């Protein structure tokens, strides 16, 4: 069965703390990562937190790239999700890891839209009151 998309989740450790706290740098890296992967950038939104950290999203025609950075830990959580068979999300994720000088990169790729989740893998959450 064909997928509706590929979702790369990347845990980046040992990143350059100054880069992780530089919103303009991260924004440019993410736009460049999308373009290198062959994606079409639609919108860009990033936010710098006080005293540190950056979160942001690059919306692409094919889906999105996101980051949440934790400079105090040298850590960044990134997602690259692409719809369709043309764009390889790993190209963007690897570029981001290199630009942030990550010493460790743990990557998980999930095919999306493959049908119902198997019961043993489904998580149930009750409503919070």
Swiss-Prot record:
- Name the Enzyme Commission number(s) assigned to this protein: 4.1.1.50
Does the keyword GTP-binding feature in the UniProt annotation?
Answer: no
Q: Which cofactor does it need?
A: pyruvate
Checking Gene3D superfamilies in the record gives: 3.30.160.750, S-adenosylmethionine decarboxylase domain
**Biological process, per Gene Ontology:** spermidine biosynthetic process
What is the documented function of this protein?
Answer: Catalyzes the decarboxylation of S-adenosylmethionine to S-adenosylmethioninamine (dcAdoMet), the propylamine donor required for the synthesis of the polyamines spermine and spermidine from the diamine putrescine.
This chain belongs to the protein called S-adenosylmethionine decarboxylase proenzyme
Kindly tell me the pathway this chain contributes to.
Answer: Amine and polyamine biosynthesis; S-adenosylmethioninamine biosynthesis; S-adenosylmethioninamine from S-adenosyl-L-methionine: step 1/1
List the active site: 63, 68, 83
Provide the species name.
Answer: Shouchella clausii (strain KSM-K16)
Recite the UniProt cofactor note for this protein.
Answer: Binds 1 pyruvoyl group covalently per subunit.
Listed NCBIfam families: SAM_DCase_Bsu
User: What UniProt keywords are attached to this protein's entry?
Assistant: Autocatalytic cleavage, Decarboxylase, Lyase, Polyamine biosynthesis, Pyruvate, S-adenosyl-L-methionine, Schiff base, Spermidine biosynthesis, Zymogen
Which residues are reported to carry the modification Pyruvic acid (Ser)?
63
Source domain of life = Bacteria
One cellular component term from this protein's GO annotations in UniProt: cytosol
Q: Point out the gene that encodes the protein.
A: speH
Claim: S-adenosyl-L-methionine is one of the keywords in the record = yes
